[in-house]
Amino acid sequence: MRLIRLYIDEPLNEGSKVLVKNDSFHYLAKVLKAKKNQKIILFNNTGFDFHGHIKNVTDRYFEIHLDKRFFLEKNMYTTEIAFSICKNPCSDFIIKKLTELGINSFQPLISKFSIFNKKKIDLEKKLKHWKNISISSSEQSERSYLPIIKNTISFQDYIDSCSSVSKIILNTKSQNMINNVYNSRTESCSVLVGPEGDFSDEEYSYAKQSDFSSVSLGDNILRVETAAIAAISYIKIINSNENK
Protein backbone atom coordinates (compact mmCIF):
# COMPACT_ATOMS: atom_id res chain seq x y z
CA MET A 1 0.00 0.00 0.00
CA ARG A 2 1.28 3.48 -0.86
CA LEU A 3 2.38 5.65 2.01
CA ILE A 4 0.38 8.77 2.83
CA ARG A 5 2.16 11.94 1.65
CA LEU A 6 1.25 15.23 3.30
CA TYR A 7 2.46 18.78 2.64
CA ILE A 8 3.28 20.77 5.79
CA ASP A 9 3.97 24.50 5.59
CA GLU A 10 6.49 24.65 8.42
CA PRO A 11 10.13 23.71 9.13
CA LEU A 12 10.75 19.95 9.44
CA ASN A 13 13.73 18.20 11.02
CA GLU A 14 14.85 14.61 11.14
CA GLY A 15 14.30 13.12 14.60
CA SER A 16 11.73 15.73 15.62
CA LYS A 17 7.98 15.55 16.08
CA VAL A 18 5.23 17.44 14.28
CA LEU A 19 1.68 18.13 15.42
CA VAL A 20 -0.72 18.03 12.48
CA LYS A 21 -3.82 20.12 13.22
CA ASN A 22 -6.78 21.91 11.60
CA ASP A 23 -7.50 21.09 7.93
CA SER A 24 -4.61 18.64 7.65
CA PHE A 25 -5.85 16.85 10.78
CA HIS A 26 -9.33 16.55 9.27
CA TYR A 27 -7.84 15.26 6.00
CA LEU A 28 -5.79 12.57 7.77
CA ALA A 29 -8.56 11.57 10.17
CA LYS A 30 -11.72 11.75 8.06
CA VAL A 31 -10.53 11.28 4.47
CA LEU A 32 -7.47 9.04 4.77
CA LYS A 33 -8.53 7.48 8.09
CA ALA A 34 -4.93 7.40 9.31
CA LYS A 35 -4.18 5.37 12.44
CA LYS A 36 -1.59 5.28 15.21
CA ASN A 37 1.75 3.69 14.16
CA GLN A 38 0.94 4.16 10.48
CA LYS A 39 3.90 5.23 8.33
CA ILE A 40 3.69 8.61 6.61
CA ILE A 41 5.77 10.98 4.48
CA LEU A 42 5.81 14.74 5.10
CA PHE A 43 7.32 17.36 2.78
CA ASN A 44 7.60 21.14 2.96
CA ASN A 45 8.84 22.30 -0.46
CA THR A 46 12.53 22.16 0.50
CA GLY A 47 13.35 19.07 -1.57
CA PHE A 48 13.33 16.74 1.43
CA ASP A 49 10.87 13.92 1.99
CA PHE A 50 10.59 13.15 5.71
CA HIS A 51 9.63 9.54 6.43
CA GLY A 52 7.98 9.05 9.79
CA HIS A 53 5.18 7.39 11.69
CA ILE A 54 2.09 8.48 13.59
CA LYS A 55 3.06 8.26 17.25
CA ASN A 56 -0.14 9.52 18.83
CA VAL A 57 -3.68 10.51 17.84
CA THR A 58 -6.05 12.81 19.74
CA ASP A 59 -9.34 14.42 18.78
CA ARG A 60 -7.45 17.59 17.73
CA TYR A 61 -4.12 16.53 16.27
CA PHE A 62 -1.84 13.79 14.98
CA GLU A 63 1.60 13.59 16.57
CA ILE A 64 4.06 12.46 13.91
CA HIS A 65 7.67 11.46 14.59
CA LEU A 66 10.07 12.09 11.70
CA ASP A 67 12.51 9.17 11.46
CA LYS A 68 14.53 9.81 8.28
CA ARG A 69 14.82 12.37 5.51
CA PHE A 70 15.66 11.91 1.84
CA PHE A 71 16.70 14.68 -0.55
CA LEU A 72 15.40 14.89 -4.13
CA GLU A 73 17.26 17.22 -6.47
CA LYS A 74 15.42 19.66 -8.68
CA ASN A 75 15.64 19.29 -12.44
CA MET A 76 18.13 21.63 -14.06
CA TYR A 77 15.51 22.65 -16.62
CA THR A 78 12.17 24.42 -16.08
CA THR A 79 8.83 24.40 -17.86
CA GLU A 80 6.14 27.06 -17.54
CA ILE A 81 2.58 27.23 -18.83
CA ALA A 82 1.03 30.64 -19.44
CA PHE A 83 -2.73 30.28 -19.83
CA SER A 84 -5.59 32.70 -20.29
CA ILE A 85 -8.01 32.38 -17.39
CA CYS A 86 -10.92 30.26 -18.54
CA LYS A 87 -14.25 29.14 -17.12
CA ASN A 88 -14.10 26.59 -14.34
CA PRO A 89 -13.46 23.73 -14.17
CA CYS A 90 -11.01 24.49 -17.02
CA SER A 91 -8.48 26.53 -15.01
CA ASP A 92 -8.67 24.19 -12.01
CA PHE A 93 -8.13 21.20 -14.30
CA ILE A 94 -5.04 22.81 -15.84
CA ILE A 95 -3.53 23.40 -12.38
CA LYS A 96 -4.34 19.87 -11.22
CA LYS A 97 -3.13 17.90 -14.23
CA LEU A 98 -0.04 19.94 -15.07
CA THR A 99 1.09 19.76 -11.45
CA GLU A 100 0.89 15.98 -11.81
CA LEU A 101 3.00 16.27 -14.98
CA GLY A 102 5.74 18.15 -13.13
CA ILE A 103 5.24 21.71 -14.39
CA ASN A 104 7.48 24.22 -12.61
CA SER A 105 5.32 27.33 -12.84
CA PHE A 106 1.92 28.64 -13.89
CA GLN A 107 1.33 32.13 -15.25
CA PRO A 108 -2.39 33.04 -15.42
CA LEU A 109 -3.13 35.67 -18.08
CA ILE A 110 -5.82 38.06 -19.18
CA SER A 111 -5.92 38.27 -22.97
CA LYS A 112 -8.32 39.97 -25.37
CA PHE A 113 -10.82 37.11 -25.51
CA SER A 114 -10.41 35.81 -21.97
CA ILE A 115 -13.72 34.94 -20.35
CA PHE A 116 -13.04 37.00 -17.29
CA ASN A 117 -15.10 39.32 -15.12
CA LYS A 118 -13.03 41.29 -12.61
CA LYS A 119 -16.17 42.17 -10.64
CA LYS A 120 -17.06 38.51 -10.08
CA ILE A 121 -13.60 36.96 -9.70
CA ASP A 122 -11.46 37.59 -6.64
CA LEU A 123 -7.96 36.97 -8.00
CA GLU A 124 -6.37 36.68 -4.57
CA LYS A 125 -8.95 34.10 -3.52
CA LYS A 126 -8.51 32.30 -6.85
CA LEU A 127 -4.73 32.15 -6.37
CA LYS A 128 -5.16 30.57 -2.93
CA HIS A 129 -7.65 28.08 -4.37
CA TRP A 130 -5.19 27.10 -7.12
CA LYS A 131 -2.38 26.68 -4.61
CA ASN A 132 -4.52 24.25 -2.61
CA ILE A 133 -5.18 22.27 -5.79
CA SER A 134 -1.45 22.17 -6.58
CA ILE A 135 -0.67 20.97 -3.03
CA SER A 136 -3.19 18.14 -3.29
CA SER A 137 -1.85 17.13 -6.72
CA SER A 138 1.75 17.29 -5.47
CA GLU A 139 0.88 14.96 -2.59
CA GLN A 140 -0.77 12.52 -4.97
CA SER A 141 1.93 12.59 -7.67
CA GLU A 142 4.84 12.33 -5.22
CA ARG A 143 6.35 15.72 -5.97
CA SER A 144 8.71 17.20 -3.38
CA TYR A 145 8.61 20.72 -4.84
CA LEU A 146 5.39 22.66 -5.32
CA PRO A 147 4.89 24.51 -8.61
CA ILE A 148 4.95 28.31 -8.50
CA ILE A 149 1.61 29.96 -9.29
CA LYS A 150 2.23 33.56 -10.24
CA ASN A 151 -0.06 36.57 -9.95
CA THR A 152 -2.33 37.17 -12.94
CA ILE A 153 -0.95 39.63 -15.50
CA SER A 154 -1.90 40.87 -18.97
CA PHE A 155 -0.91 39.09 -22.17
CA GLN A 156 1.33 41.99 -23.22
CA ASP A 157 3.11 42.14 -19.86
CA TYR A 158 3.83 38.44 -20.07
CA ILE A 159 5.22 38.65 -23.60
CA ASP A 160 7.42 41.58 -22.59
CA SER A 161 8.80 39.84 -19.50
CA CYS A 162 9.19 36.23 -20.65
CA SER A 163 12.88 35.27 -20.65
CA SER A 164 12.70 31.52 -21.35
CA VAL A 165 15.15 29.99 -23.81
CA SER A 166 12.32 28.26 -25.70
CA LYS A 167 9.11 30.25 -26.19
CA ILE A 168 6.09 28.55 -27.74
CA ILE A 169 2.58 29.79 -28.50
CA LEU A 170 -0.07 27.25 -29.48
CA ASN A 171 -1.87 28.17 -32.69
CA THR A 172 -4.36 25.93 -34.50
CA LYS A 173 -3.64 27.78 -37.77
CA SER A 174 0.10 27.18 -37.66
CA GLN A 175 1.63 24.82 -40.23
CA ASN A 176 4.49 24.13 -37.84
CA MET A 177 4.06 21.09 -35.60
CA ILE A 178 5.41 21.32 -32.06
CA ASN A 179 7.97 18.55 -32.69
CA ASN A 180 9.58 20.67 -35.43
CA VAL A 181 10.23 23.46 -32.94
CA TYR A 182 10.91 21.69 -29.65
CA ASN A 183 12.89 18.51 -30.31
CA SER A 184 15.66 18.73 -27.72
CA ARG A 185 15.71 19.86 -24.11
CA THR A 186 16.51 23.48 -23.30
CA GLU A 187 17.25 25.14 -19.98
CA SER A 188 13.79 26.73 -19.85
CA CYS A 189 10.62 26.48 -21.91
CA SER A 190 7.41 28.54 -21.78
CA VAL A 191 4.20 27.43 -23.46
CA LEU A 192 1.44 29.96 -24.13
CA VAL A 193 -2.10 28.64 -24.54
CA GLY A 194 -5.06 30.82 -25.45
CA PRO A 195 -8.63 31.08 -24.11
CA GLU A 196 -11.74 29.42 -25.55
CA GLY A 197 -11.97 32.26 -28.08
CA ASP A 198 -8.29 31.92 -29.04
CA PHE A 199 -5.76 34.74 -29.17
CA SER A 200 -6.41 37.66 -31.50
CA ASP A 201 -4.35 38.17 -34.68
CA GLU A 202 -2.72 41.15 -32.97
CA GLU A 203 -1.70 39.00 -30.01
CA TYR A 204 -0.18 36.33 -32.25
CA SER A 205 1.71 39.03 -34.10
CA TYR A 206 2.96 40.61 -30.86
CA ALA A 207 4.17 37.24 -29.59
CA LYS A 208 6.00 36.57 -32.86
CA GLN A 209 7.85 39.89 -32.54
CA SER A 210 9.16 38.67 -29.17
CA ASP A 211 10.47 35.39 -30.61
CA PHE A 212 7.58 33.13 -29.68
CA SER A 213 7.33 30.21 -32.11
CA SER A 214 3.80 29.52 -33.30
CA VAL A 215 3.09 25.76 -33.25
CA SER A 216 0.21 23.36 -33.80
CA LEU A 217 -0.74 20.16 -31.98
CA GLY A 218 -2.48 18.67 -35.02
CA ASP A 219 -5.66 18.99 -37.05
CA ASN A 220 -8.20 18.72 -34.25
CA ILE A 221 -9.56 21.71 -32.37
CA LEU A 222 -8.74 21.08 -28.72
CA ARG A 223 -10.18 22.45 -25.52
CA VAL A 224 -7.88 24.79 -23.61
CA GLU A 225 -7.10 22.23 -20.93
CA THR A 226 -6.55 19.45 -23.49
CA ALA A 227 -4.11 21.60 -25.47
CA ALA A 228 -2.19 22.52 -22.31
CA ILE A 229 -1.91 18.90 -21.19
CA ALA A 230 -0.89 17.67 -24.66
CA ALA A 231 1.83 20.30 -25.06
CA ILE A 232 3.35 19.85 -21.60
CA SER A 233 3.18 16.05 -21.90
CA TYR A 234 5.15 16.22 -25.15
CA ILE A 235 7.78 18.54 -23.63
CA LYS A 236 8.06 16.28 -20.58
CA ILE A 237 8.78 13.29 -22.82
CA ILE A 238 11.49 15.18 -24.73
CA ASN A 239 13.08 16.41 -21.50
CA SER A 240 12.90 12.98 -19.84
CA ASN A 241 14.42 11.17 -22.83
CA GLU A 242 17.53 13.33 -22.59
CA ASN A 243 18.04 12.21 -18.99
CA LYS A 244 18.67 8.64 -20.19
Residue ranges and their predicted role:
Residues 1-71:
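N-terminal positively charged helical leader segments and presequences
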Residues 18-20, 76-80, 187-190, 209-217:
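Glycine/charged-rich beta-loop-alpha catalytic/anionic-binding loops adjacent to active sites
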Residues 201-244:
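Structured adenosyl-cofactor binding patch, chiefly the S-adenosyl-L-methionine
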Residues 165-204, 212-215:
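Active-site/ligand-binding-proximal alpha/beta "capping" segment
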Residues 73-166:
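RNA substrate-binding interface of SAM-dependent RNA methyltransferases
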Residues 40, 64, 146-150, 214:
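Generic structural signal for residues in well-ordered beta-strands
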Residues 11, 69, 110-113, 219:
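Short, ordered loop/turn segments at secondary-structure junctions
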